[in-house]
């Protein structure tokens, strides 16, 4: 994506492959951030086609990450490209910020934020739904520790619990031992 943007004449910044951005330079001070990510949760089972193939089905591009968040990122980039090709120059710089690990922990974005020269004055994310998502969930990973010793028993022990492939996806199967 960064190579394509540079080829189209946009300035780019790559934070050592932890994240980056594409700038459509404005004529005045200020940056509007358009924030997206290019990673996906694991594909899981049950696909009728290649989940990473970007299949066109009934006029829609379908596949893992097509709405969260590759589709919105690509649409944002092509909107910037179309404006540029029409001769439009924005007043504020439009910065398309590209994260690479939103689905896990955003540590790459922490790295990006430490290395970028200037943060946006405000921003939005064109994530997954039109016309807007008014709130986003977060990721909370935690351990629950509790002694399980019902009265009259010799005690039970939960030695492991496993399920799913990512902390922010719904597991199709879970197992407790």
Spans of model-derived segments:
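General structural feature for long, well-ordered alpha-helical segments within catalytic domains
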Residues: 1, 14, 30, 72, ...
């Amino acid at each position: 994506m960064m190579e394509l943007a540079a080829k189209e004449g946009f300035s780019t910044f790559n934070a050592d492959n932890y994240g980056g951005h594409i700038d459509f330079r404005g004529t005045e001070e200020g940056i509007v951030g358009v924030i997206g990510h290019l990673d996906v949760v694991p594909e899981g089972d049950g696909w009728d086609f290649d989940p990473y193939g970007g299949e066109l089905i009934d006029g829609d591009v379908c596949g893992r990450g097509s709405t969260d968040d590759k589709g919105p990122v690509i649409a944002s980039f092509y909107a910037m490209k179309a404006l540029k090709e029409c001769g439009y120059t924005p007043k504020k710089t439009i910065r398309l910020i590209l994260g690479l690990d939103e689905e896990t922990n955003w540590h790459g974005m922490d790295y990006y934020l430490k290395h970028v020269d200037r943060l946006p004055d405000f921003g939005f994310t064109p994530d997954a739904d039109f016309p807007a998502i008014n709130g986003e969930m977060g990721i909370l990973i935690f351990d629950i520790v509790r002694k399980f010793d019902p009265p009259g028993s010799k005690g039970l022990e939960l030695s492991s619990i496993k399920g799913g492939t990512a902390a922010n996806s719904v597991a199709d199967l879970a197992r407790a031992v």
